[in-house]
């Protein structure tokens, strides 16, 4: 007989990911993402001076994707920010968390706020057909579009509407073990690449270390995701972020591309755009994934005048062909 604990050990074994429309109920180990926490009486005030969102306006039952920028308005990282325990927490890509935290802490010595990485808490994604019903058998209350965050003892649950309903579970070890014991045999299991694939489909920007301090928030559609407040007080990089809006300085946007390729590009790679008989290098890859059906999906920052008629390809891959896919939101200024 298989020992339950070894059968469902984290991280889960990697399978090729599925598009949201093809995905069966799946639990996803989010080992490529990492958590940080902030507690103390000055936390809201301190964060207000560091991130693009209006932290004071974030409700207890809400979460927001915002950016932490350098003085030039370039993003160290984007952060999924929410209330957690006695303070706040945020989730970002693991490969840049330590650098981002050291930047975030630079001025915290003058504030009553404690900022720390948290690797004891477990991050799990839950997505696919019937996942709400399965989670409802474990948790007495689940978040939804109107109340996107629900707190339980040892568990913070985040709701995402796109590309199809999914959940991000922020769990203490005990609730995590209990969840896996109850649902482990009723769901598929996969690793971070499945969640990354859903983020690409949803147009949620992925900032890895290769692209840290490279882009202003608007180049990754953060304004369209309500991640930038243009009415709050000062924060690091605000002047450049505001200039991009009011002077039309931003000429880039985030795109979801799909098609065929012989290789999956890496974060930081450029792509090629077809111009008649020729191909011209363009853009920057943020993330990419090869799906179960062989398709390759790419999330890239490109000139914001691209449209569905444009054809792109992975650099130096003559057989590659990628086209622009519709995002579930309008790109605004």
Swiss-Prot record:
One of its GO terms (molecular function) is folic acid binding. It is found in: Cytoplasm. SUPFAM superfamilies: Aminomethyltransferase beta-barrel domain (SSF101790), Folate-binding domain (SSF103025). GO terms for biological process: iron-sulfur cluster assembly; RNA modification; tRNA processing. Folate binds at residues 33, 195. It holds the Pfam family YgfZ_barrel. Keywords: Cytoplasm, Folate-binding, tRNA processing. Its main location: cytoplasm. GO terms for cellular component: cytoplasm. Folate-binding protein involved in regulating the level of ATP-DnaA and in the modification of some tRNAs. It is probably a key factor in regulatory networks that act via tRNA modification, such as initiation of chromosomal replication. Belongs to the tRNA-modifying YgfZ family. This is tRNA-modifying protein YgfZ. It comes from Pectobacterium atrosepticum (strain SCRI 1043 / ATCC BAA-672) (Erwinia carotovora subsp. atroseptica).
